[in-house]
């Protein structure tokens, strides 16, 4: 079921003129898609409650670094089938069905979101208050019609609470005015979780016996890169030299770190290189010792990395290596 859903998402994104990465398993996301300035990190799950806390934290952190929107596409929750046209949320990440995602891509956003206690909608509290006052309808009268308290109506008008879909429809019909607002699942999430400290990330990597990765990440950090270490992605770290808030002005290096090179490492590095091209960024494979040169992969030994002065020097090295292999 998951593989079918993944295939359908790939087809849909291509039809919608997105540039997408090849799918890869055992990651906090399955696809990266880009169209114009919109960047999506998509996770496909049959059961959206199977997303772990660790996966969600990493997905949010990578999204923040890449200025991308994380989206989960699934078919059910732990307890029930997901409703079409409704937005669910897991760990701050929006989750929808395939059909709801497709409708969003053609400009028809969902209007209902699932929360504890049922399904709710976002309404325009200002329009609600102005219309009620214009029609000289009291708060008490509207509360009685809607079968909610006066206090609740006040909260709706101040955008401090949202009604259920049923209550919102009653209010719209009584006032004869549209109030329900669509939910754009492609909006960037405000206040994405901050990255964990490097000490926390190092502690986890050390537990896994990854001393070599610690050495490489330390070197990159000393150069002046902002770093995000990962354990649930096809790359081991994201190094950022930011020149501003605009994603197009970022210099990002997706970094794979391995002591020895083998076919599996090369395959992963080529996938990461593809991701870097989609996002107009860079990829780098750092090894203990370089073996045979693979023209499709930009790689260097740790001894070469140690000789690099700063972020500018490393980016220049990568650019020159790219040009020499064309």
From Swiss-Prot:
Gene Ontology terms for molecular function: DNA binding; DNA-binding transcription factor activity
Keyword vocabulary terms for this entry: DNA-binding, Transcription, Transcription regulation
SUPFAM superfamilies assigned: lambda repressor-like DNA-binding domains
DNA-binding region: 139-158
Domain HTH cro/C1-type: 128-183
Pfam families listed in its UniProt record: HTH_3 (PF01381)
Name assigned to this protein: Putative HTH-type transcriptional regulatory protein MMP0678
């Amino acid at each position: 079921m998951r593989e079918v859903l993944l295939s359908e998402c790939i087809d849909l994104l291509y039809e919608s003129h997105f540039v997408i990465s090849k799918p890869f398993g055992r990651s906090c996301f399955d696809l990266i898609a880009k169209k114009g300035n919109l960047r999506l990190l998509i996770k496909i799950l049959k059961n959206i409650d199977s997303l772990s806390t660790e996966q969600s934290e990493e997905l949010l952190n990578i999204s923040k670094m890449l200025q991308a929107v994380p989206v989960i596409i699934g078919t059910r929750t732990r307890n029930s089938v997901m409703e079409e046209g409704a937005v669910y949320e897991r760990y701050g990440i929006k989750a929808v069905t395939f059909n709801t995602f497709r409708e969003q891509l053609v400009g028809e956003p969902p209007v209902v979101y699932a929360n504890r206690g049922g399904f709710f909608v976002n309404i325009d509290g200002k329009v609600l208050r102005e219309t009620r006052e214009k029609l000289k309808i009291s708060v008490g009268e509207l509360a009685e019609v809607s079968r909610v308290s006066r206090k609740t109506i006040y909260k709706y008008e101040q955008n401090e609470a949202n009604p259920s879909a049923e209550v919102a429809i009653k209010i719209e019909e009584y006032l004869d005015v549209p109030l329900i607002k669509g939910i754009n699942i492609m909006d960037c999430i405000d206040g994405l979780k901050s990255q964990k400290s490097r000490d926390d990330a190092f502690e986890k990597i050390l537990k896994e016996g990854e001393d070599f990765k610690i050495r490489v990440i330390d070197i990159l950090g000393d150069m002046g890169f902002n770093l995000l270490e990962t354990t649930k992605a096809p790359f081991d770290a994201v190094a950022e030299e930011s020149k501003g808030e605009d994603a197009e002005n970022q210099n990002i290096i997706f970094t794979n770190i391995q002591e020895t090179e083998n076919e599996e490492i090369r395959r992963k590095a080529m996938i990461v290189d593809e991701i870097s091209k989609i996002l107009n960024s860079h990829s780098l494979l750092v090894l203990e010792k370089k073996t045979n040169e693979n023209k499709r992969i930009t790689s260097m030994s740790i001894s070469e990395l140690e000789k690099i002065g700063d972020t500018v020097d490393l980016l220049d090295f990568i650019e020159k290596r790219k040009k020499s292999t064309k």
